[in-house]
Amino acid sequence: MPQLDTSTWLLTILSMLLTLFVLFQLKISKHSYSPNPKLVPTKTQKQQTPWNITWTKIYLPLL
């Protein structure tokens, strides 16, 4: 049974990693970022809930 020739694996793996690195660099470099991002303040709206309007007794006093 012939053995698997692994002598070219290192070259294959290194070339694949280099190719992936170059492709990702090209993909990232084409992405456009806004030069001056502005913060938009978000306004929280307070919702009226029934327990905020009236106080209710939730326990019995100790006797």
Swiss-Prot record:
Localisation per UniProt entry: Mitochondrion membrane
GO biological processes: proton motive force-driven ATP synthesis
Pfam family, one: ATP-synt_8
Keywords of this entry: Acetylation, ATP synthesis, CF(0), Hydrogen ion transport, Ion transport, Membrane, Mitochondrion, Transmembrane, Transmembrane helix, Transport
Keyword Ion transport listed: yes
Subunit comment: Component of the ATP synthase complex composed at least of ATP5F1A/subunit alpha, ATP5F1B/subunit beta, ATP5MC1/subunit c (homooctomer), MT-ATP6/subunit a, MT-ATP8/subunit 8, ATP5ME/subunit e, ATP5MF/subunit f, ATP5MG/subunit g, ATP5MK/subunit k, ATP5MJ/subunit j, ATP5F1C/subunit gamma, ATP5F1D/subunit delta, ATP5F1E/subunit epsilon, ATP5PF/subunit F6, ATP5PB/subunit b, ATP5PD/subunit d, ATP5PO/subunit OSCP.
Annotated membrane topology: Single-pass membrane protein
Record family assignment: Belongs to the ATPase protein 8 family.
Gene: MT-ATP8
PANTHER family: ATP SYNTHASE PROTEIN 8
Protein name per the record: ATP synthase F(0) complex subunit 8
Gene Ontology, cellular component aspect: mitochondrial membrane; proton-transporting ATP synthase complex
Functional note: Subunit 8, of the mitochondrial membrane ATP synthase complex (F(1)F(0) ATP synthase or Complex V) that produces ATP from ADP in the presence of a proton gradient across the membrane which is generated by electron transport complexes of the respiratory chain. ATP synthase complex consist of a soluble F(1) head domain - the catalytic core - and a membrane F(1) domain - the membrane proton channel. These two domains are linked by a central stalk rotating inside the F(1) region and a stationary peripheral stalk.
Source organism: Balaenoptera musculus
InterPro entries tied to this protein: ATP8_mammal (IPR039017), ATP8_metazoa (IPR001421)
GO-annotated molecular function: proton transmembrane transporter activity
Transmembrane segments: 8-24
Keyword field contains Membrane: yes
